[in-house]
Amino acid sequence: REDNLKRLGLAAERLACDATTLETEPFDAILLDAPCSATGTLRRHPDVAWIKQESDVFKLAQLQSRLLDQSIRLLKPEGRLVYCTCSLEPEEGEMQIENALKRHPALRRDPIRREEMGGLSAALTPLGEARILPFMAFEGESALSGVDGFFIARLGLRK
């Protein structure tokens, strides 16, 4: 949102469109907050467990794969891509990244560093991705404060 960009002193061009068919000049960086099953929001939205089906995860994973492929095509050489979902499902997180790395030889992980985790360093995986679980709490806070579940990976293109 514009107010968040302003508050953080950042400038960005935001696009809201069908990214699977977007034709444009390449970008330096892309944030792909992919549509997902929202299983990471169960703490706040317990109905997700009853309204989402396994077939929903499968369909969403297919869409995420297409969005990832298109986002990678739209990156400049040495560009960066942050992929995230509010899903707890590996098919929508870790497996998406593994498969994208296999499909795109120029793609590489750009590991998230501990100091970038803002009090949730326990969520950092050995591969430098973030797997935030609803029972986690920011360092120094009670686990009762709760967070939504997320998966976050940062990727880059080699020259």
Predicted regions span which residues?
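S-adenosylmethionine
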Residues: 1-159
